[in-house]
Structures are given as C-alpha cells and as structure tokens.
C-alpha cells in the first residue's frame, strides 16, 4: 500500500460481494495520508451504500456520468485530472471486458478510458469467471495497455467454492 501513501486516489468500486472490502480500503488509504474520491457503479450500490462510502472518504460519491449537480463540469475529466492514481477494487469481469474493448457507457469505464494516470485493478470473481478464456484475453489486453493487476488470490469464495478469484 506504500505506493498509495499521501496521494489523491480515485477508488472505483464495482458490483460484487467483495465491494464491502472497499470500505476498509478507504479507511487504510485515509490513514496513510491520502485523499480518496470514489465512484460507485450501479451494481456496486447493491453491495455498499453511498452513505457508507462518503462517511469514510469524507467526500462526495460519484455514480452517474450525467451529474445534475454541476452540468458544466465533466466528472470523468475532472476526476481523472484530480487523481494521482486510480484503484479499481473490486473490478468485475464485466468491467474488465468493458475497458478492454473501449466501452465507455458509464462513469467508471469513461474515467478509466479518459485517464493517463497509473491504474491498478483488483479483480474479484468466481474461479470459473477468472479462468474463462474471454477474461484471460481481456487481462492480457489491459496489461499491454499498462494497467497493473493486484491479485487475485486463491481461497474460499462467497459462493462456497475454492480457487483463484478472491480480491487481494
């Protein structure tokens, strides 16, 4: 976590059972002196609430590419410029696929495509999803684009299975 000390970190939280771990990540980043802004995907809000995230980050939670708060501001550009680094934890197979194919349909994927900052991805998914040929191809693409992967780990999963796919 030393890389993330005393920096502006944009944390993107995708939808998956591991999303609850992002709350601890926010706490650790803040403890290390970093400022943390967050983006929640639509499905992430099924696992963690904007209130929990904003309470820990002490910042507004971003979740919509078309924000009614300030129509003149382009959140995907301003957030990308603000961040020293971007951490996506957890990142799902769906978001990996979106970014690898250049799909920019929501705020999270748009920020990732618009950024020239270092981007770290912490995958979390079922072992069969992690091992699927499409996922493997997309991971190779993203690594070639310069994205850094953190994990996943091998272990027991929420679905009751064991294997590689746990968020590190």
Regions found by a protein language model. Give the residues of each.
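A cross-family phosphate/adenosyl-ligand binding-site feature
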Residues: 1-120, 126-168
